[in-house]
Every structure is written in structure tokens, then in C-alpha cells.
């Protein structure tokens, strides 16, 4: 009810139309109540007539294989039976653009083929780099949806440039892909869900 209330009380549903296939990201980090949050999001989207599905979005984690990444999200309870929609995985990527320095922007093929994307992730400070956007919905776009190839391109300049590259690639994805919403989760000091916020792609 909490998630549905946030979505229905805001202008976020204007872009969600019946029949739209919408990809929801699920990462490799253990997020409190992840499966429940995804289930409620799926339920709301289905009420709008959309056709949601979940994709593991975790760069090269899970051994950089679709099977390995599916196993990770299944361990977190994100299964078709629980969340109420297909849970699909691929490591194939599609080039959707380039940065001004000629570096390719890659995203997961399933996300690229969807009518819309919802980037869902926990927002927190990163342990290895600093930047305007650290761990959160923007890094999920760049590293998570980038799969192994996208993550490698972003990391190529080293950890010192990772903060700026996460931002650059994320804005490139926002420009070239239909990112409908971001769902940001903030946990308290006990790693319990404290705040959930929904943002438009803009």
C-alpha cells in the first residue's frame, strides 16, 4: 500500500500505459525487503495494465552469466512465483549511444527491448569511490544494466574516475533509453528499510 500510494499520488503513472512491457532491475546486494518491494511495484504496474518483468542488473556479478545472476536474485526471494511476473536474465547488451569521447553506452538487451525501465536500488555511499552519484539508481543504470561489457567500459579509466563515469554513463542512458522511474531505497543503521522514494526519469 505504501508503494502504491506513492505512485498513485504522484505524476509518475502518466507514462505507464496498458500493454507496456516494463523492465524492473534487481541488484546483487542484499536489500532489506527487496522481494516484497518488487512484488508491490509489480502489482501496481499490473493494475495499470502494464506487463512488468524483472531482470537481474548487477554488472559482472554471478560469474558474469545469466544463470549465476538468476541464482543470486532467487536467493533474495525474487522469483516469478513470489513477485508475480517473469524473472528473465541475459548478459547480452545493446549499444544505445556513445559518450562525447567515443566510448560506447551499453545496456542489457532485455531492458533495451522493453517499452520502459524502472531502476530500483538502495541508495548509499560507496565504499570505494566518491561522486555526485555513488551506490543507487544511477549506478544501477550504468553498472547494473551495463552487464559485464558496460561495467568494463565504465571501469576502464580506473577507480579515480569511477564517480564521474557513473554519472556520465547514467545520463547517457537516461538520454537514449526510456527510463520511466527510479525507485530509491534508504536503509537505517540496522540495515532495515527506512525510506522509499520514487523519481521520474527526468
What is the role of each PLM region?
Residues 32-52:
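Histidine-anchored nucleotide/phosphate-binding helix
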Residues 122-202:
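Catalytic cores of enzyme domains
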Residues 1-18, 31-35, 118:
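An N-terminal, well-structured beta->alpha segment
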Residues 18-21, 48-51, 82-85, 101, ...:
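Short coil/turn connectors at secondary-structure junctions
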Residues 31-38, 63, 126-129, 140:
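Short glycine/serine/threonine-rich phosphate/pyrophosphate-binding segments
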Residues 21-30, 53-58:
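Short glycine-rich or small-residue beta-strand-to-loop segments that form or flank ligand, phosphate
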Residues 68-132:
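An acidic, phosphate/nucleotide-engaging active-site surface
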Amino acid at each position: 500500500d505504501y508503494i502504491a500510494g506513492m505512485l498513485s499520488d504522484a505524476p509518475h503513472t502518466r507514462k505507464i500505459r496498458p500493454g507496456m512491457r516494463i523492465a524492473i532491475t534487481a541488484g546483487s546486494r542484499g536489500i532489506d525487503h527487496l522481494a516484497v518491494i518488487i512484488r508491490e511495484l509489480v502489482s501496481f504496474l499490473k493494475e495499470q495494465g502494464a506487463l512488468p518483468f524483472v531482470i537481474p542488473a548487477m554488472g559482472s556479478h554471478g560469474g558474469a552469466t545469466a544463470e549465476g545472476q538468476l541464482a543470486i536474485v532467487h536467493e533474495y526471494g525474487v522469483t516469478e512465483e513470489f513477485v508475480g511476473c517473469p524473472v528473465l536474465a541475459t548478459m547480452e547488451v545493446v549499444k544505445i549511444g556513445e559518450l562525447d569521447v567515443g566510448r560506447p553506452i551499453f545496456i542489457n538487451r532485455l531492458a533495451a527491448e522493453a517499452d520502459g525501465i524502472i531502476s530500483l536500488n538502495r541508495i548509499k555511499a560507496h565504499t570505494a569511490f566518491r561522486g555526485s552519484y555513488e551506490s543507487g539508481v544511477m549506478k544501477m543504470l550504468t553498472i547494473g544494466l551495463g552487464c559485464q561489457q558496460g561495467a568494463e567500459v565504465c571501469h576502464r579509466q580506473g577507480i579515480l574516475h569511477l564517480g564521474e563515469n557513473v554519472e556520465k554513463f547514467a545520463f547517457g542512458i537516461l538520454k537514449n533509453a526510456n527510463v520511466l522511474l527510479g525507485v530509491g531505497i534508504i536503509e537505517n543503521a540496522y540495515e532495515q528499510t527506512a525510506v522509499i522514494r520514487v523519481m521520474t526519469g527526468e
